């Protein structure tokens, strides 16, 4: 067996495999993706403007086990499972499904009925997510035991530690012993992240700077009279500072930027290019094989071409007689 038929078969199998991959992705593109949450209503439209002015019934079905069920039921809904309205003037079908649940997730088809045969118009892929049961309530911050004669000072605190990649802008409400603080952490890259300071006190220690976790409860920060300092509008330098809480997170690490996720569909154009240009060399190889076999042919010396030459035994030469000798005789 010559090598070029084997190559042709391998390329043919490769083409079939690539065609299967492309057809699989094309089936996904047939459906329009729709996302809803439980309790919401689905309302979609199917257009049939390219159809002639024929009276055709419309239907809405759900794909189950590679079949489209036109009589699917939704037991938790009172009345019909869906409503379908056909506007013949604008040639648009409107389908509505109320009280969605996670069980409604799946693939649906809007079809037309022509003489008992169903033909698809538009496909939809519905994804229903669970409803949000709890909502996050942010409590309001209340200042307790704040005298009326309190004053507000703002300033910028520079941390002397060279490894700390941020500075802290502090806004402080002070009145004798009780005060309230709130600040912003400014990263070295220029990004500001709000970090409310609640539920702990400032203590002078000789450690590193740690950032505590956020506390959902709003409590006023207290400072003992012995450690209370008056902040002026000008920046002041503090040697070391730590924030103590039940669980804390060190901020002396290095920030690594997240790399964006690449799209998973970038290989589709490459596959289309391969399918476009791959058949050309295959056809050229096959055509060259047939042309070579037809025009150049094969040369065979026969079955006796390998036998040695046979030399006949040489006998004594007969004497030469001229032709006129026969006449004289």
From Swiss-Prot:
Any one Gene Ontology molecular-function term assigned to this protein's record: signaling receptor activity
Chain residue ranges for the region called Disordered: 202-259
Keyword Transmembrane helix part of the UniProt annotation: yes
Inducing or repressing factors: Up-regulated in neutrophils and macrophages in response to bacterial lipopolysaccharide (LPS) and inflammatory stimuly.
Record's bilayer topology term: Single-pass type I membrane protein
Major site of localization recorded for this protein: membrane
Matches recorded under InterPro entries: Ig-like_dom (IPR007110), Ig-like_dom_sf (IPR036179), Ig-like_fold (IPR013783), Ig_sub (IPR003599), Ig_V-set (IPR013106), Immune_rcpt_domain (IPR052314)
GO biological process, one term: T cell activation
Extracellular-side segments: 25-270
Protein name: Trem-like transcript 2 protein
Gene name as annotated: Treml2
Biased composition (Polar residues): 217-259
TM annotation in the entry: 271-291
Gene3D superfamilies registered for this protein in UniProt: Immunoglobulins
Cellular component terms per the entry's GO annotation: cell surface; plasma membrane
Function: Cell surface receptor that may play a role in the innate and adaptive immune response. Acts as a counter-receptor for CD276 and interaction with CD276 on T-cells enhances T-cell activation.
One of the Pfam families matching this protein, by short name: V-set
Tissue: Detected in B-lymphocytes and macrophages. Detected in spleen, lymph nodes, blood, bone marrow and cells from the peritoneal cavity (at protein level).
Location of the protein in the cell: Cell membrane
């Amino acid at each position: 067996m010559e090598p070029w038929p084997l190559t042709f078969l391998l390329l043919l199998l490769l083409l079939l495999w690539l065609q299967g991959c492309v057809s699989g992705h094309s089936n996904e593109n047939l459906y329009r993706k729709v996302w809803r949450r439980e309790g919401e209503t689905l309302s979609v439209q199917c257009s049939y403007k390219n159809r002639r002015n024929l009276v055709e019934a419309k239907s809405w079905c759900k794909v189950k086990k590679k079949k489209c069920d036109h009589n699917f039921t939704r037991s938790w809904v009172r009345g019909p499972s869906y409503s379908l309205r056909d506007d013949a003037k604008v040639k648009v079908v409107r389908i509505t499904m109320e009280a969605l649940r996670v069980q409604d997730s799946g693939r649906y088809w809007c079809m037309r009925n022509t003489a008992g045969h169903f033909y698809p118009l538009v496909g939809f892929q519905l994804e229903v997510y669970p409803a949000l049961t709890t909502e996050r309530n942010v409590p309001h911050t209340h200042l307790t035991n704040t005298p009326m004669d309190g004053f507000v000072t703002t300033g910028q605190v520079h941390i002397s530690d060279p490894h700390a990649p941020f500075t802290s802008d502090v806004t402080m409400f002070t009145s004798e012993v009780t005060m309230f603080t709130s600040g912003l952490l400014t990263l070295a890259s220029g990004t500001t992240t709000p970090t409310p300071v609640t539920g702990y006190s400032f203590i002078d220690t000789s450690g590193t700077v740690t950032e505590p976790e956020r506390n959902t409860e709003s409590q006023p920060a207290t400072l003992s009279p012995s450690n209370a300092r008056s902040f002026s509008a000008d920046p002041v330098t503090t040697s070391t500072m730590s924030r103590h809480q039940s669980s804390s997170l060190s901020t002396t690490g290095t920030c690594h930027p997240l790399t964006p996720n690449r799209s998973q569909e970038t290989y589709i154009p490459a596959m289309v290019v391969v399918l476009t240009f791959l058949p050309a060399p295959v056809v050229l190889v096959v055509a060259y094989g047939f042309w070579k076999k037809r025009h150049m042919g094969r040369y065979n010396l026969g079955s006796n071409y390998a036998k040695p030459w046979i030399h006949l035994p040489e006998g004594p030469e007969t004497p030469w007689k001229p032709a006129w000798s026969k006449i004289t005789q």
